[in-house]
Structure formats: C-alpha cells, structure tokens
Amino acid sequence: MTMSTTAVTTDEYRPTGRPTHRVEVYGADGARRILRPARPADVRAIAELVRPYAERRVLVAKDLISYFEDIQEFIVAEEVPGGVGGAGGETPSPAVPRIVGCGALHVMWDDIAEVRTLAVQPDALGTGLGSAVLRELIAQARQMGLKRVFCLTFEEPFFGSHGFEPIEGTPVGADVFSEMLRSHDDGLAEFLDLARVKPNTLGNARMLLHL
C-alpha cells in the first residue's frame, strides 16, 4: 500500500494572515498524518526527532536556536487521531497529535534550493512518509519558480527514486560562486564543496534534481 496524498483547504491562518497549506496523507500503516508549515511551538519536537540521526552523523547536529531561526523553512508531518490502523487494524491512532516527520527547503540562489533535515520517526519508516515530505518540499520549490533542488545525503537510492542525480563539483557559474562565498552558512559551503567542510561530507552523495 503506497501513501496517498490529498491537498485540503483549511481556514487556519499563520501570524502573517496567510492561510496555511496542509496536505493530508495516509501511510502504509494506516495512520493519518497532516503535512503543514512548522511553527515555533514545533521546534523542540523537531530537535528531538532529528537528535538520534544527528548522533549517528546521518544529519547535521544543530543548536536549538538554529531551529528557531530557520523554522519558516520547515514543514512537519503531524500524526493525528482518525487513522484507520494497520493492515489488521491493530495500530491505534494517537490520543493527541505528535510530530513524526520533518523537512526543510533552504533557498540558496534565485534558481536553486536545498532539501535539509529530512527525517521521520523510526516507527514511521517504511510507510511512505519520507517520500510524502520530500514531494511536498519539491512542490514548494516549483511554486517558488526554482529550477533545481540540491541535497547532500547518505540515502542515494531514496533521493534517486525521486529524480535526483549524483553530481560532481559545483553546478553554478563563477560569478554566482563568488557571491555564495560571502555566506556563513555551512550548508551552502557544503554545496560549494569547500575544503573547510570536507570532514562533514565524507560518505555523502551530492545530488541534484532538475525541475
């Protein structure tokens, strides 16, 4: 059973007055989950979700303040009551909503962004949730008029299944490269393949999706 996604319209509003974009998904485990923009109140749940991956150096470890500063880049997958259970109906819905997945889209230039901090709870692995989060981030990139999406990952087969291809070097011209060098963002330094961040990228695949 593959995860299905259905966009739903809500009357929920962010502090800016703009309505949130929410996508309702049902996974292979029958759980009902909502993909939505992250809020500051989600930061600690995101940090706790990422922590075991960061401890294994699968994802970059970040201070709590970094999540607050970047929260507008994140979407979360929130598991909510109302799921249908697993194949045998034995998987209960949570009594209260919980964050079971996250991902971020960081714009690096006028035509390119990076997928960052894509993670799901261990008990949601294999349900299609990671793919649903990634598809939503790619959809956001398209809506913003971006042409390419970059990722730095150990999960080459997963991203490859979504159209990402391995790359060598830095896929920008010299003028853009020199402008990007002005940034203090480590993720952008990894995109540029700078020597100072090489220890952080060992074993990772550099991949690019053309939209």
Model regions and ranges:
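Ala/Thr-enriched low-complexity intrinsically disordered regions
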Residues: 2-10, 16, 87, 91, ...
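Conserved acetyl-CoA-binding loop-helix of GNAT-fold acetyltransferases
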Residues: 120, 126-139, 150-151
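C-terminal "cap" of GNAT-fold acetyltransferases
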Residues: 172-211
